[in-house]
Amino acid sequence: MLLYIFFLMYTTRSRDMSTLQSNMFKFYNAPHSGMYPTFWVGHLKTMIKICVKRSDVINFNKPLDKEMLEMMYGSLLGDASAEKRKGGKGTRMLFYQEGSHNEYLLFLHRLIANLGYCNTNIPKLQTRISNNGKIRKIIKFSTWTYDQFNEMHKNWYINGKKVLPNDIDQFLSPLALAIWIMDDGGKMGKGLKLATNNFTLNEVKQLMAMLDVKYNIKSTMHKTGAMDQYNMYMLSDSMPILVKKIKPYIVPSMKYKLGNYM
């Protein structure tokens, strides 16, 4: 009986995954003009060059453009990570989202693929068993390995632990802020929560001060319940200011995080 129940769970999950993957493919290949803010449409054009292996790539020696760096910094403030390759000289970026946010990750993948920094194969939903035994759907992809990413890894990591880099102010643009919120923000009452629990208390305070000075966005800290972990909460009075700055970059599937302010 137990085996039969497991079989039913597996076949149901397989059908669900197949349906989700089919819907993702339709979304990925849909025309994006009119669907996304004008800023992104040029970046989300149909692939001109299909890159599925390293020999297809032509930008390994080019400097990173400012928009790419801002997107990387915004992503690293959230769930993204930079990985120094073992036995190699370069670094790659890894992007991860829960399956419920697959549209955002597909958007990010298509964007970065069109900029020439990752494989153009469409990411696939995967299943994982969490520590409490629940089945989770996740979706992820990584960039190619670049020497140009080494400086970013050096700035963001000390002894393998993510830290807030000294040059964060230089790259915390409205674009980076939008990417950070889409990646790791969450609606909380009339404000917005950012999961900053991976950063130290002083780093969270630094981010709060930076947003205040740079954009006049006020925020507070909330303890997460775990020792020495804090989340940021952007106050409702600052939400109109925030939305005005980031609205040109927010994709449709992430508008819900900003509630009625969008």
From Swiss-Prot:
Which GO terms of type biological process are on file? mRNA processing; RNA splicing
Q: Does the keyword Protein biosynthesis apply?
A: no
Top-level taxon of origin: Eukaryota
Q: Write down the Gene3D superfamilies for this protein, in alphabetical order.
A: Homing endonucleases
According to the record, the segments passing through the membrane are none
For this record, an example GO cellular component is: mitochondrion
Q: Which Pfam families match?
A: LAGLIDADG_2 (PF03161)
Query: Has the keyword Hydrolase been applied to this entry?
Result: yes
Main localization (coarse)? mitochondrion
Q: Supply one GO molecular-function term.
A: endonuclease activity
Location comes to: Mitochondrion
Q: Which UniProt keywords apply?
A: Hydrolase, Mitochondrion, mRNA processing, mRNA splicing, Nuclease
Cross-referenced InterPro entries: Homing_endonucl, LAGLIDADG_dom
Could you say which protein family the record assigns here? Belongs to the LAGLIDADG endonuclease family.
> What function is annotated for this protein?
This protein is responsible for splicing and maturation of cytochrome b mRNA. Specifically, it may be responsible for the splicing specificity of the second intron.
Q: What else is known?
A: Encoded within intron 2 of COB.
Q: What is this protein called?
A: Cytochrome b mRNA maturase bI2
Protein species of origin: Debaryomyces hansenii (strain ATCC 36239 / CBS 767 / BCRC 21394 / JCM 1990 / NBRC 0083 / IGC 2968) (Yeast)
Q: Which gene encodes it?
A: bI2
